[in-house]
Amino acid sequence: MLKPLGDRVLLKIEEKEQTVGGFVLAGSAQEKTKTAQVVATGQGVRTLNGDLVAPSVKTGDRVLVEAHAGLDVKDGDEKYIIVGEANILAIIEE
């Protein structure tokens, strides 16, 4: 399992095809955001005083993330993205 460092977050993107009138939209025509599940978080960032500020998200949260943010990574057969916490726009509460 991958463990992000600092304020980085490991996400599993929830894949969904978008259609218009039965036609599947190309990737570039889809939304500017993606829904993802938080798989793991880094420990947070340190302030100038040395205090640790923990991430705002936790493992299991569903989040809204910028569509083109992050770095694609693989762990075995699983595909993930690693993003900075600043690229997470919102926590989806259900």
From Swiss-Prot:
One Gene Ontology biological process: chaperone cofactor-dependent protein refolding
Pfam families assigned to the protein according to its UniProt record, in alphabetical order: Cpn10
One cellular component (GO) term of this entry: cytoplasm
Alphabetic keyword roster: Chaperone, Cytoplasm
PROSITE patterns (alphabetical): CHAPERONINS_CPN10
Main subcellular localisation: cytoplasm
InterPro entries: Chaperonin_GroES, Chaperonin_GroES_sf, Chaprnonin_Cpn10_CS, GroES-like_sf
Cellular location(s): Cytoplasm
GO MF, any single term: ATP binding
Oligomer and partners: Heptamer of 7 subunits arranged in a ring. Interacts with the chaperonin GroEL.
Family: Belongs to the GroES chaperonin family.
Protein name per UniProt: Co-chaperonin GroES
Organism: Streptococcus pneumoniae serotype 2 (strain D39 / NCTC 7466)
Lineage, opening ranks: Bacteria, Bacillati, Bacillota, Bacilli, Lactobacillales
